[in-house]
Regions:
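Short amphipathic alpha-helices in soluble, non-transmembrane regions
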Residues: 24-26, 85-91
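Amphipathic, hydrophobic secondary-structure cores in small proteins
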Residues: 40, 44, 57-60, 73, ...
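Terminal, regulation- and interaction-focused segments at domain boundaries
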Residues: 1-27
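Short, conserved charged micro-motifs
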Residues: 17-22, 79-85
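Short beta-strand-to-loop capping motifs
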Residues: 11-15, 73-78
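A short, structured beta-strand/loop element
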Residues: 46-65
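A generic structural signal for short beta-strands and their flanking turns/coil linkers
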Residues: 7, 38, 47-49, 67-71
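A common structural junction motif
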Residues: 28-31, 91-98
Length: 99
């Protein structure tokens, strides 16, 4: 989790698209949202959020192969605090692993 979320940023995630789609509803929380073929859009107050994704080439580290998804996050009409509040929940639901 970060302390600041820009209006637009990109990430890589180590998951498959079916895994991502399984986690997405809980990560979105109670905000009304719609899913497209490779995107999701949400209304947050008077602003909006959109995430677009595409499958990338798997990352290979020695004999291990890790799936990779490229994500682009875009907020419109939300201030720093609103973006942080939404992404705090989103990131907690998307977080995997221990440590």
């Amino acid at each position: 989790m970060q302390s600041f979320y820009a209006e637009r940023f990109e990430r890589e995630m180590g998951c498959t698209e079916p895994e991502w789609l399984g986690w997405l509803p809980n990560a979105m929380g109670d905000v009304p949202w719609q899913r497209g073929a490779s995107s999701a859009k949400a209304a947050i107050g008077t602003g909006s959020f959109e995430v677009q994704w595409r499958t990338g080439e798997p990352r290979r580290i020695g004999l291990a192969t890790i799936p990779r998804m490229h994500m682009q996050f875009v907020f419109a009409g939300l201030d720093d605090a609103q973006r942080y509040t939404f992404m705090k929940r989103f990131d907690l639901y998307m977080q995997r692993g221990g440590g």
